[in-house]
From Swiss-Prot:
Pathway membership, UniProt: Amino-acid biosynthesis; S-adenosyl-L-methionine biosynthesis; S-adenosyl-L-methionine from L-methionine: step 1/1
EC number: 2.5.1.6
Taxonomic classification: Bacteria, Pseudomonadati, Pseudomonadota, Gammaproteobacteria, Pseudomonadales
Keyword tags: ATP-binding, Cytoplasm, Magnesium, Metal-binding, Nucleotide-binding, One-carbon metabolism, Potassium, Transferase
Protein name: S-adenosylmethionine synthase
Name of a matching Pfam family: S-AdoMet_synt_N
Residues noted as binding K(+) in the record, renumbered to the chain: E44
Binding site for Mg(2+): D18
Transmembrane annotation, as ranges: none
Any one GO cellular component localisation term in the record: cytoplasm
Top-level taxon of origin: Bacteria
Organism from which the protein derives: Stutzerimonas stutzeri (strain A1501) (Pseudomonas stutzeri)
Catalyzed reaction equations: L-methionine + ATP + H2O = S-adenosyl-L-methionine + phosphate + diphosphate
Assembly and binders: Homotetramer; dimer of dimers.
């Protein structure tokens, strides 16, 4: 039986201030890694009324027109006029990026690439569950679907009075580990001042909520809270300061799994906060896809400058078809979780990261991208290409 009878997760749109910051940080990473695959990047962004501040540490041979890059991201999200409270074309851009510490570099860089040390100490978690088709928890999956649809309806002109900032929240009811109903839906969306609240609520219900959520899970007692405070005209960086790395639960499993605390956006793959969390998802998803367990959470930890993980632990919450200790042995046999090996296994040295910075890093569909002369697959950590080998090794 599921550990939870009711569980709630939330998501935010690409126009949420914290997500603007995440997307800018990852756009900077992409621009650098497109020219210098082995660059070291740690980029943080702050956005507030009329200004974007970009800071961090970078070691690279690449040159990036950072000001234009930041403006392009902001405008692309939808902040293109003072009428919506933020204008990427005219806002101030402050660049305070410096160089990476040589003390860190000496702990990471090695003559033999496979001996590359972790960029920092830390612990990372990966998770998967068979409750949805993408092996993600349903509450975060559905929450992402709502704000993705909000952005789609805004950008394609279906609901042209929508503005970029939005938040969603979904409460799911479980029986025996599977979702049997949605008990509550919250969707708050920024909008133009001239739209009537009654029209907004009807349109959001019919064209966003009902379009995004499985009809069979909505029932007569489902609670709907659409812009529950009423008017939501002032939003984005005018309403709230946005910072990189403040939506780490939205980025991962919606609280259904534990989190080591490290954010992803703006960090190159040498930072295990990001790459090892991606590897953890890859491992957990393949374990569930192989049928070794219905749910799986894995923890990996590292010491700065050391290649081998300091620990690997795993929990299948009583759903494993064999013991957790035996599954850990299979993980060690089939997955090399040293930092360089993760980068190679998941092919992470490509400019794929801005695409991860909104609507979740996990539960996405791998797809081919081309940037300049570089063609690669994004979201490789969502592949289940190890499932057959794991199943065979487990004797299932």
């Amino acid at each position: 039986m599921s550990e939870y009878s009711i569980f709630t997760s939330e998501s935010v749109s690409e126009g949420h201030p914290d997500k603007i910051a995440d997307q800018i940080s990852d756009a900077v990473l992409d621009a650098i890694i497109a020219e210098d695959k082995h660059a070291r990047v740690a980029c943080e962004t702050l956005v507030k009324t009329g200004v974007a501040i970009v800071a961090g540490e970078v070691t690279t041979s690449a040159w990036v027109d950072l000001e234009q890059l930041v403006r392009d991201v902001i405008v692309d999200i939808g902040y293109n006029s003072s009428e919506v409270g933020f204008d990427g074309a005219t806002c101030g851009i402050i660049n305070i990026i410096g160089k990476q510490s040589v003390d860190i570099a000496q702990g990471v860089d090695r003559t033999k690439p496979e001996d590359q040390g972790a960029g920092d100490q830390g612990l990372m978690f990966g998770y998967a569950s068979n409750e949805t088709d993408v092996l993600m928890p349903a509450p975060i999956r559905f929450s992402h679907a709502l704000v993705e649809r909000q952005a789609e309806a805004r950008k394609n002109g279906l609901l042209p009075w929508l503005r970029p900032d939005a938040k969603s929240q979904v409460t799911c009811r479980y029986e025996n580990g599977q979702v049997v109903g949605i008990d509550a839906v919250v969707l708050s969306t920024q909008h133009n001042p001239d739209v009537k609240q009654s029209d907004l609520r009807e349109a959001v219900m019919e064209l966003i909520i009902k379009h995004s959520l499985p009809a069979e899970l909505l029932h007569k007692d489902t609670q709907y809270h659409i812009n529950p405070t009423g008017q939501f005209v002032i939003g984005g960086p005018v309403g709230d300061c946005g910072l990189t790395g403040r939506k780490i639960i939205v980025d991962t499993y919606g609280g259904m799994a534990r989190h080591g605390g490290g954010a992803f956006s703006g960090k190159d793959p040498s930072k295990v906060d990001r790459s090892a969390a991606y590897a953890g998802r890859y491992v957990a998803k393949n374990i569930v896809a192989a049928g070794l367990a219905d749910r799986c959470e894995i923890q990996v930890s590292y010491a700065i400058g050391v290649a081998q993980p300091t620990s690997i632990s795993l929990n299948t919450f009583g759903t494993g078809k064999l013991g957790d200790d035996k599954i850990i042995a299979l993980v060690r046999e089939h997955f090399d979780l040293r930092p360089y090996a993760i980068t190679r296994m998941l092919d992470l040295l490509h400019p794929m990261y801005r695409a991860t910075a909104a609507y979740g890093h996990f539960g996405r569909t791998p797809y081919e991208m081309t940037v300049g002369a570089d063609t690669f697959t994004a979201f490789t950590w969502e592949k289940t290409d190890k499932a057959d080998a794991l199943r065979a090794a487990a004797g299932l």
